[in-house]
Regions:
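Membrane-embedded alpha-helical bundles of multi-pass integral membrane proteins
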Residues: 1-274
Length: 275
């Protein structure tokens, strides 16, 4: 028997998910559009030359996260959350490809090593990263940190989505007696505890309720993301790629103080699109 799982096990009316995807995409798309509109109001600036150097900058600062790593504690939890999110996003994409396009990727060793083991481990690491970030923000409280309600809501939402994922996975493993369940270590912990406390029918009910709650939470988060500082997840690599490669101070122009009526930038259109 080849290792895999039924994608929509215990879930009916899947069309509702696709219906909810429409307002989610509209809300998120409008948020991205607002950012693009502001950028387009800026002055033109050539920032796509020397592509090799720009790719190196992206690898150094966006992928390797050299700047963030200067603070060891912050660098660690930032890496756990960001790399974990990449893995979870890839895993979600694989599920969508299998469900909607019949690609049959979720099979065999790939299903066991990546879709089960790696996804579980990285999901847990995201939760650890969130707890570390919360400890820094609310216990250590460094002076340089800007404290906002939004930051706390983002951390809570990310932690909740990961927790929901483990509950949904664990109840599915337990209720179906999944022979491959041990490959999902944290979901399997939920499954083992649930078998002692819940009937199969109770697990099925809990599973479908948590599945829809997880979907609603995830869609709401995606719709909200472009309106929060989490937008930097998408813009940071682009921002780094489009950084000025000119020597420091090369962009400064000589100012005639007698003839110039205004100094600096006093309108949005005075900046370049990159600024």
């Amino acid at each position: 028997m080849e290792a895999t799982r039924e994608i929509y096990w215990n879930v009916t009316q899947v069309w509702v998910m696709y219906a909810l995807l429409v307002p989610t995409a509209v809300a998120a798309g409008y948020g991205v559009y607002r950012h693009l509109s502001r950028w387009r109001r800026g002055q033109p600036a050539a920032r796509f030359d020397r592509p090799r150097e720009r790719v190196r900058l992206v690898l150094k600062h966006a992928v390797a996260q050299r700047r963030t790593a200067r603070d060891a504690f912050a660098g660690l939890f930032h890496a756990l959350i960001s790399y974990g999110f990449v893995v979870l996003t890839v895993a979600t994409t694989v599920v969508a490809l299998d469900a909607d396009f019949g690609t049959a990727i979720m099979r065999g060793r790939f299903y066991l090593y990546f879709q089960s083991l790696a996804v579980d481990v990285f999901g847990a690491l995201v939760m650890v990263g969130v707890l570390m970030a919360a400890a820094r923000r609310y216990l250590r409280r460094p002076r340089k940190l800007v404290h906002t309600d939004e930051a706390g809501l983002i951390l809570a939402a990310v932690f909740l989505m990961c927790l929901q994922g483990f509950l949904v996975e664990g109840w599915r493993i337990a209720a179906t007696d999944d022979p491959w369940g041990a490959w999902s270590p944290f979901g399997n912990l939920v499954a083992r505890a649930s078998r002692r406390l819940m009937s199969v029918e109770a697990m099925r009910t809990a599973h479908v309720s948590a599945w829809w709650f997880h979907l609603a939470t995830s869609f709401a988060f995606v719709a909200w993301l472009p309106y929060t500082k989490m937008m930097h997840v998408l813009t940071a690599p682009l921002n780094i790629y489009a950084a000025s490669l000119a020597p420091l101070g090369a962009a400064l122009k000589r100012v005639d103080f007698e003839k110039t009526e205004s100094f600096g930038v006093n309108t949005l259109g005075g900046f370049t699109w990159k600024d």
